[in-house]
């Protein structure tokens, strides 16, 4: 029976994420990851036949971390506004991981519209629909508006184009949320009047 590897697949993925946090996803290679682990490149190449497969594994784990971060909402906060603020705060606290998730081309979904149709979002959309009383189509429309707004803010902050001010961001996010709901309700009312 061969000896059990001392450097595991999970250790390598964790090391890759540490490298990304420090210097960005572009710097992931067998040397940088093995340097983080203080080992030769052999364990990295043993567990991952290509660096791209390592990046994909690191992406999946980072995506899971991001989802958990987003869903950690205080009980007294509106869920959608909480998710939006957490999305932006993640870009503030983890700018390199944010860039890896949303600006590297490793996303499984090829567009934001595909993300909105993903199964993982159904509970969030259902909660929004219950809270607003709108159709699922209008709920998706409102979510897309708020998501685009939050993503824009987060991208600007992650790329050092703006200082983070939570009070200001929360106010803008709430205005976007309320405006999107108001526009969706107005559209529904106008549609009902024409029918």
Residue ranges: model-predicted function:
Residues 100-103, 147-165, 179-190:
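Amphipathic C-terminal alpha-helical segment
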Residues 1-7, 188-195:
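N-terminal intrinsically disordered/low-complexity leader segments
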Residues 7, 11-18, 22, 53-72, ...:
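Alpha-helical structural segments
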Residues 71-97, 143-146:
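Hydrophobic alpha-helical connector segments
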Residues 108-134, 140-144, 171-182:
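Amphipathic alpha-helical packing segments from all-alpha helical-bundle domains
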Residues 29, 99-101, 110, 165-166, ...:
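Short, hydrophobic secondary-structure boundary micro-motifs
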Residues 11, 15, 19-53, 57:
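Helix-turn-helix
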């Amino acid at each position: 029976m061969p000896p059990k590897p001392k450097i595991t697949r999970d250790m390598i993925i964790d090391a890759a994420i540490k490298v990304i946090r420090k210097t960005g996803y572009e710097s992931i290679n067998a040397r940088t990851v093995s340097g983080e682990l203080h080992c030769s490149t052999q364990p990295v190449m043993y567990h991952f036949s290509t660096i791209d497969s390592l990046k994909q594994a690191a992406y999946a784990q980072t995506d899971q971390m991001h989802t958990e971060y987003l869903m950690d909402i205080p009980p007294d906060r509106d869920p959608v506004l909480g998710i939006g603020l957490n999305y932006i705060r993640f870009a503030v606290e983890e700018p390199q991981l944010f860039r890896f998730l949303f600006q590297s081309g490793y996303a499984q979904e090829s567009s934001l519209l595909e993300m909105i149709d993903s199964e993982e979002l159904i509970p969030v959309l259902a909660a929004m629909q219950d809270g607003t009383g709108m159709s699922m189509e209008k709920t998706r429309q409102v979510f897309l508006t708020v998501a685009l707004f939050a993503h824009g803010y987060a991208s600007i902050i992650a790329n050092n184009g703006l200082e983070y001010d939570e009070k200001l961001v929360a106010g803008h996010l709430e205005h976007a949320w309320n405006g999107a709901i108001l526009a969706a309700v107005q559209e529904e009312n106008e549609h009902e009047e024409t029918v």
